[in-house]
Design a protein with these regions (language model features):
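Charged, heptad-repeat coiled-coil alpha-helices that serve as long linker/dimerization "arms"
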Residues: 1-97
Length: 97
């Protein structure tokens, strides 16, 4: 499933919230400010997790390719990191659910 449109929508909302938070009178309504800050924090954490997931997926793919190279030392180093990357991916996927 392609989550790109959903993630982009969330990223746009995060940018909107950051613009609102930057306004000088943002804290005049404490209740509204608190709600916005809570939503901002949740979206920021989501985007950070999503970005980490993508970076880890790319690193895993790179390591899988490097593990097939003719350089035995490089292949071994890359292969050693694969289980760690797979575990990190599982955790990130779990965090997104």
């Amino acid at each position: 499933m392609d989550y790109t449109p959903l993630i982009e929508k969330r990223r746009q909302r995060l940018e909107e919230l950051e613009t609102v938070i930057a306004e000088p009178d943002f804290f005049n309504d404490q209740k509204k400010a608190s709600e916005i800050m809570r939503e901002h924090r949740r979206l920021k954490e989501l985007m950070e997790t999503w970005d980490s997931l993508n970076a880890t997926e790319q690193q895993l793919a790179d390591n899988q390719e490097l593990a097939k190279t003719d350089d035995p030392e490089l292949a071994e180093l890359a292969a050693l990191e694969i289980p760690e990357l797979e575990a990190a991916l599982e955790k990130l996927r779990s965090d997104l659910q």
